[in-house]
Amino acid sequence: MYKDKNNVVEDSFQAFLVDGANFTKNEEYPIIESWMIPKLPPKKIMPFDKALNYHGDLSDVYICTYARDCTFERIRKNPKRYLNFFKRCAGIIGFDYSIHSDMPIVKQKAQMNDNLSLSFYYGKQENNIIPNIRYGIDELADEYLS
């Protein structure tokens, strides 16, 4: 176990993403709370990679990650770095790291967990979150949607 100079254990698994979360019963996916979800639909939507280079006002724009994973992998690697960016936006459509039905189930579950963990984290930071409903094989649907 690695501790820094302040004797704090390094959070290499990014447990901070789900700090304060409630979890589903079996797989313990973090639950996106109802107060994180906006009442009104988005007026505008822009992909993350386009929004990063956009020099205009993003205050009425929801950011989505419907693109190749490599265009937004940087968020998963360093979520704190993008806090200020997402604060400039109207909200986030839940993350969409790829889940394919031919992936090993453990990898599907890991991707589902990352999608929900990041969505929860940014929701807790008072960003509006529109949950992204994405699961792999049908057998995973009940737990994911609980």
Descriptions of predicted regions:
Residues 2-86, 93-95, 103-104:
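Non-catalytic, usually N-terminal nucleic-acid engagement modules in DNA/RNA processing proteins
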Residues 72-146:
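Eukaryote-skewed repeat-based solenoidal scaffolds used as protein-protein interaction platforms
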